Amino acid sequence: MAVLNVNVSPPQVAGAIRQAAATTGTSFEYLLATAQIESRMNPAAQAPTSSAGGLYQFIDQTWLATVKNAGPSFGLGQYANAIVQGPDGRFDVPNPAARTAIMGLRNNAQVSAMMAGAFTRNNAAQLSSALGRKPSEAELYVAHFLGADGAGRAGSFVASGSGRRASASEWVIRTVR
């Protein structure tokens, strides 16, 4: 289980993102902006205060869930098969070497962008169902940050508020406080 070189230039990262956007049907501009916000286009970025890592700063559980569920569609079946979901819903990789390899894939620009596209596509479907419309890119980013359920609650907050439609960023600020 080898991980490709993470020392790639911004044009190579942008190329990986463009390919992921085309393959997953996700907006290139959205994936590019999210990578810029999350990691400054650095595939090897690691958050100092959480398990978040890689181009899109996936936390461990979100990464494992995304690889488990979407990985087989993108040639990552061997990795997906190594991931198990426990009765508590948490994902784990019992084999330490396999876990290291799977978590290392977050630092591969091509794999990370592909999984971000699949994750975004899934979030968009869940949000469309919850909101009754196509989600905005701001709502998709809230889903990247809080998960689709959290972003769906953001839509509910906006709908049930003072009648004024708040932006997704206003909702995040209010929620975090």
Cite the ranges covered by each PLM segment:
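Extracytosolic helix-loop segments that constitute the early lumenal/periplasmic catalytic or substrate-binding loops
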Residues: 41-42, 71
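Alpha-helical, low-charge segments enriched in small hydrophobic residues
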Residues: 36, 50-51
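Short, solvent-exposed loop/turn and secondary-structure capping segments
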Residues: 45-47, 68-69, 154-157
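Alpha-helical segment that forms one wall of the substrate-binding/catalytic cleft
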Residues: 64-134, 139, 145-153
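Catalytic and substrate-binding regions of cell-wall glycan-acting enzymes that process beta-1,4-linked
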Residues: 136-177
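Extracytoplasmic
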Residues: 26-29, 53, 135-137
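Active-site-surrounding "flap" and adjacent substrate/cofactor-binding loops of secreted or lumenal enzymes
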Residues: 52-65
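Export/targeting segments at the very N-terminus of extracytoplasmic proteins
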Residues: 1-41, 106, 110-114, 118-131
